[in-house]
Amino acid sequence: MGEGDPLDTQRYPPSPAAELGGSGFADVQEIGRGGFGVVYRCTQEDLDRTVAVKVLTVELDEENRARFFREQRAMGRLTGHPNIVNILQVGATDSGCPYIVMPYHPQNSLEARVREGGPLALDQVLRLGVKMAGAVESAHRLGILHRDVKPANILLTDYGEPELADFGIAHISGGFETATGAVTGSPAYTAPEVLGGDPPSPAADVYGLGATLFSALTGHAAFERRSGEQVVAQFLRITTQEVPDLREHGIPDDVSAVIARAMSRDPISGRPLPPTSGNSYEGCNATTASLSTRWHFVRNPMRRGTGSNRPRAADGCRSLPRRGARRDVSPWN
């Protein structure tokens, strides 16, 4: 190559995987890609543990870069919740790509579990609903919206716990904003009013939770995109049609009613959510109470109507394994 040849000075940025290898991570393997990042499974050598590292790829625009920082901030404020994925570390590669380190969950997501194994049993879905409603409620108490509650964002741990992940498009009150009218979630799990151009709200997260439970019970989304269907046509069905009746799938009346209400097209009077933003978490709290009561009856049918044995709304969220007590059989299998 001759002197002064432009190829002689051309520089190619190293891959994120290669850079992670120089940041204390070993056995770096790509395990997934999202709208704005790549996820790697790595070994964190200094702590002898396997972790998942989400890296913001260099080719993404500033909007998606800002979205990644929103995830860091939101997830940091929620660290410690038993049903929300924890952040273990944040950093940046030598070329400036930011990353977050999270626990690695080989059990995969709820979406993968349903796709591979079909619908979950009623008691599993009720347990899932109680815990996810508690997770969303906790986020709402901090003024945080998830904006994309769906099966793919619920990870299943080795300890039998569901954990809500990917607050990458979350909104923190007083912080970052998303342009009104921009749909940043997954259409089949996005509230009708958001598809119509309204900004996301706590009620929209309640809708996403209801749509997720519908999918877990039936094996498919209530308004799943049909083969050959245009996205506009799918939007039209979501915004104009009633939610399919879960009783036709053999789901009890009370459970069907809770999910139908959570997925109501009316975000104010239809969903279990008062209009005052100060009490926005009550929407998920009401859903938790309904699901927790039904879950209690499914598990303890002989205790129906025994007064003192009725569970409180938060009881289901407290039924957690002791820290460090590994379960031999996952309830998701």
Question: PLM ranges: what are they?
Answer:
Residues 205:
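Conserved catalytic-loop aspartate of Hanks-type protein kinases
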Residues 128-129:
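Activation segment signature within eukaryotic-like protein kinase domains
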Residues 28-34, 39:
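Protein kinase glycine-rich loop
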Residues 89-91:
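A short, aromatic-enriched beta-strand patch in the conserved N-lobe beta-sheet
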Residues 132-144:
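Protein kinase catalytic-loop region centered on the HRD/HxD motif
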